Regions:
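N-terminal Rossmann-like or analogous alpha/beta NTP/dinucleotide-binding catalytic cores
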Residues: 1-78, 172-186, 228
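Active-site cores that bind ATP or allylic diphosphates and position pyrophosphate for catalysis
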Residues: 3, 60, 64-193, 198-207, ...
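Glycine- and acidic
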Residues: 3-7, 159-164, 214, 370, ...
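Catalytic adenosine-cofactor/nucleotide-binding cores of aminoacyl-tRNA synthetases and other
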Residues: 10, 186-347, 354, 411-443
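Residue-level signal for inorganic ion chemistry
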Residues: 21, 52, 56, 108, ...
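Generic alpha-helical structural context detector
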Residues: 23, 50, 182, 231-234, ...
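C-terminal accessory/binding modules appended to enzymatic or scaffolding proteins
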Residues: 297, 353-410
């Protein structure tokens, strides 16, 4: 696998942004055998440009550049195709002015013959465009730096790229690239253009406009699993032609085809309040639910430790069955199961200890009975189940009224994982200490 960084636009590329790209790819498990930066291959790009110029298939445009965009695209608006005055300068005069140091943009000399340039796109099908509708696009900017068109084609040829797979917004650029390949005497690769990922308002995703939500590392840091995020990305504009949604990396590789790609742009749904797409969260939760406990423990341990807690792998293995069905993101372990890791529970309202259809007096009776019961009960799931149900019967109350105050006392809230498993993992000493503190709050 080859990783090529298109960084010829030196003003817009920074080492920080490149590092973020590298980290994102590595997190997704996309490793590479060779790495190239286009900015380090300028000699190769210029060699192709000089070859095309020598064949008379390009010309120097000495018109003062109005802007970088104008130099890149060949026009600043309207239906500009070429500048006849520049296009028709003789080779001798062009060479003389270039040697004298006069700045120029090197442009491709698009033939004005009305020829139809055709290619088959693996996603969008047969495409064609007349050369009469293609402007004399730039190959080299006035500072000598190659444009995207030239650099991409030169590198594709040199690295023997078989398939160019890129965003749909480059579909029209392909006609220009075919002309470059033809002029260089190189066979064009196959092309496949993918639908774009767009924001809910229909705009193209942009870090400048939409912030960190467009960065892969944002999802990594939020607690997404790499395999789940790949699953989500693949389903944006592609489907396996059946009703499957949760798929492993191996399953995706096995069934993927260009034929399954939708031509419509794919929307990533996010808001300021909910920065992550609901489908992405659901898929992540599904992958978490089906992970082996040991594998999930490897993912959760760093999250817990980074929050300043110390926990053994054995203890984490006990916790996982209690929370695995309740977390959507890895970081949720700190909210769903925080009471497993803290030495002392955060403050909570003593009113939370009062069971339904009960009062503070009943809550106090329940907790005092629980303290007595748990001091001698067998501290296993089944042993705790039997002992606490017997205690409820002894008090003449429903089991739910017994369990509610205990759950709040040991977890600090009413919503928590299954009670008996939670008590077993916390252990006798911790449970008794927390119940004693709850009794003190009620008194």
């Amino acid at each position: 696998m080859i990783l090529r960084i298109d960084d010829t636009d030196l003003e817009r590329n920074t080492e920080q942004s490149l590092q973020s790209i590298f980290e994102g790819l590595e997190w997704l498990g996309l490793d590479w055998d060779e790495q190239y930066r286009q900015s380090e291959r300028l000699a190769l790009h210029r060699q192709m440009a000089e070859s095309i110029l020598a064949k008379g298939l390009a010309y120097r445009d000495f018109t003062p550049a109005g802007s970088a965009d104008e130099a890149e695209t060949g026009h600043s608006g309207g239906a500009w195709l070429s500048n006849p005055g520049q296009r028709e300068i003789s080779a001798e005069e062009s060479d003389r002015r270039a040697v004298a140091g006069e700045p120029f943009v090197l442009r491709f000399r698009v033939p004005r013959t009305g020829e139809e340039i055709r290619f088959h796109d693996a996603v969008y099908g047969d495409q064609s465009k007349s050369t009469d509708d293609i402007e004399d696009f730039a190959l080299l900017r006035s500072n000598g730096v190659p444009t995207y068109h030239l650099a991409s084609c030169a590198d594709d040829a040199d690295l023997r790229i078989s398939h160019v797979v890129r965003g749909q917004d480059h579909l029209t650029n392909t006609f220009k690239h075919i002309l470059i390949f033809r002029a260089a005497g190189v066979e064009a690769p196959q092309f496949a253009h993918l639908p774009l990922l767009i924001a809910p308002d229909g705009s193209k995703l942009s870090k400048r406009k939409h912030g960190p939500v467009v960065s892969v590392t944002t999802y990594r840091d939020a607690g997404f699993l790499p395999q789940a995020f790949i699953n989500f990305l693949c389903l944006l504009g592609w489907s396996p032609k059946d009703d499957r949604e949760k798929m492993t990396r191996e399953e995706l590789v096995q069934v993927f085809s260009f034929e399954g790609i939708n031509r419509s742009n794919a929307v990533i749904n996010f808001t300021e309040e909910n920065p992550f797409d609901a489908k992405a969260l659901w898929l992540n939760a599904e992958h978490i639910r089906t992970m082996a406990a040991a594998e999930l423990a490897e993912q959760l341990m760093p999250v817990v430790e980074s929050a300043g807690f110390t926990i053994t792998p054995e203890k984490m293995a006990q916790i996982i069955p209690l929370i695995q069905e309740r977390i959507h993101l890895l970081r949720d372990v700190l909210t769903v199961g925080d009471f497993f890791f803290v030495t002392e529970l955060p403050p909570y309202d003593s009113a939370e200890l009062i069971p339904k259809k009960g009062d503070a007096a009943l809550a106090l009776r329940v907790l005092e009975k629980a303290l007595e019961t748990l001091a001698t009960a067998e501290f296993t799931h089944d042993g705790l189940d039997a002992a606490l149900r017997a205690a409820a019967e002894n008090l003449g109350i429903k089991a739910g009224q017994m369990f509610e105050p205990i759950r709040v006392a040991v977890c600090g809230r009413k919503t928590a994982p299954p009670l008996f498993g939670t008590l077993e993992v916390l252990g006798r000493e911790t449970c008794l200490a927390r119940i004693e503190r709850a009794i003190s709050k009620l008194k």
